[in-house]
Amino acid sequence: MAHVVIMGAGLGGMPAAYEMRAKLGKAHRVTVVNSVDYFQFVPSNPWVAVGWRTREEVILQVAPLLERKGIGFIAKAVTQIDAEASKLVLADGQELPYDYLVIATGPKLSFEEIPGSGPHGGHTHSVCSVDHAQKFWADYQEFLKNPGPVVIGAMPLASCFGPAYEFAFILDADLRKRKMRNKVPMTFITSEPYIGHLGLGGVGDSKSMLESDMRNHDMKWITNAKTTKVEAGKMFVTQLDDLGNVLKDHEVPFKMAMMLPAFKGVDAVAAVPKLCNPRGFVLIDEHQRSKAYKNIFSAGVCVAIPPVEVTPVPTGAPKTGYMIETMVSAIVHN
């Protein structure tokens, strides 16, 4: 009897659990381990941030959903992966042996790389988790009483640019509904070499379409932007030219800011010898299998995918929902 353990209960971990359970016979066990007891639908976080959805509308309790399918669930953080011994060590010291491990943890949000950034002790917000979205909503309600400039965008080494654009237009729409948009200058600051690059070298006419829409919605932007630090009410940005030379230094004022951070691998995964690249992302082969450990597979944002192209300010390649689902299907069949 094989025991398959899945780390993570997000857009990768949950489909992995369901597909694995459906594919394997009842003689085999499937267990999901997650640091919290709920699933959050991350794509809805921008709506939570402006009050269009509540927390309760975008999360689900995991245990009953998995257990009725015969899938085990443990709501504890993993502190160590002992890949040689094929076991996990959980936050309470419990050891969980596995025959196969699927890593679908998502990323660690690397706010510490830019001094002064992040919602915990920093001066910027994020919509990468429902907790962060709720914090933006709480601060946004106070902001509406005395509005001012807003900055939205993505930090150097970010890879998930779509939600930054989405959030800019969501915030624009919400402010217009409130008849307050004219009181809120908006600046989009991104490490992309041009608007609509998206970490993909552009998608069709994304550059011209997004530039046009942003002009029509009175949004200014700074591209090739290397944000270096954030202070209360001020973002320090070095803008590079296409050759990587300094073009201009900006000090951008803001009253609220939502900047998507760079990602890294979570600590327990990044610490495993030979498993990951220097940023902690799992190195995999064409079968989604670890190059170092033949019984470890990985899917989602936590896998190592090279950038589509070299950019003056480093950018990463995004890993989207459908892409993650196909990774999961490959793991199950392999």
Regions found by a protein language model. Give the residues of each.
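A Rossmann-like FAD-binding core segment of flavoenzymes
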Residues: 27-31, 68-80, 96, 172-283
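Short amphipathic alpha-helices and their capping/turn segments at secondary-structure boundaries
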Residues: 21-26, 90-95, 283-291
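FAD-site-proximal beta/loop scaffold in flavoenzymes
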Residues: 110, 119-146, 253-326
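Beta1-alpha1 glycine-rich phosphate/pyrophosphate-binding loop at the start
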Residues: 2-72, 156-200
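Internal hydrophobic alpha-helix adjacent to the cofactor/substrate pocket in enzyme cavities
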Residues: 173, 321-334
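Short amphipathic alpha-helical segments
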Residues: 17-20, 44-45, 113-116, 164-165, ...
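FAD-binding core/adjacent interface of flavoenzyme oxidoreductases
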Residues: 1, 68-166, 170-179, 247, ...
